[in-house]
Amino acid sequence: MPRYVAFLRGVSPMNCKMPDLKRCLEDAGFTNVKTVIASGNVVFDSRKTAESSLERKVEAAIKKGLGREFLTCVRSVDYLQKMLDMNPYSDFKLKVGSKRVVTFRRDNTSVDLKLPFELDNARMLRLVGQELFSVYVPSPKSPAFMQLIEKSLGKNVTTRTWETVQKVVRA
C-alpha cells in the first residue's frame, strides 16, 4: 500500500498532541499511522493516491477529531526519497552552520522568484516543482527568513528541515 507524509502547518506540542493527531487519522481510516517529532509530521498508508484528496481527508479528520484546522501538504514517501536522492543543495557552497530547509507548497501555481536569492543569513536556492529549497544560518533574524518565504510563496506552505524530511522517510 502506498505510504504518505502529511506535513501540517503551525503544529506544536502546545496546540496539538501527537497521540490525538494519530488517533484522528486512524479514525479516518488511514493505516500504519506514525507521528514524527512533535511538529505535525504524520506518516501513514492509504489506498487513495491523489495527494490533494488526501490533504482534504487529513484536514477533515483533524477538524472532526480535534476541532482544529491546520493546512496540510501531503507527499508520497517515494517522492520524498527521490527528492533526498536528488540533493538539491549539492550545487551550492553552504556556509558553516547552515540549516537546510524545504518549503512544501500546497499548490503548484506559478511563482516568479529570482533564485538564488540571499537576505541576511538566509538563501533561497532552488524551486523544484512545488518545493523551495533554502538554507539559513540560525540567528535572531531567522523568523524574518520565514516571513520572507511566506511573502514570496503565500501562506499555503509549510517548512521542514532537511533532517526532518529524512526522518519521516525512514519512519
Tell what function each PLM region has.
Residues 2-39, 43-171:
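Surface-exposed, charge/polar-rich loops and edge strands
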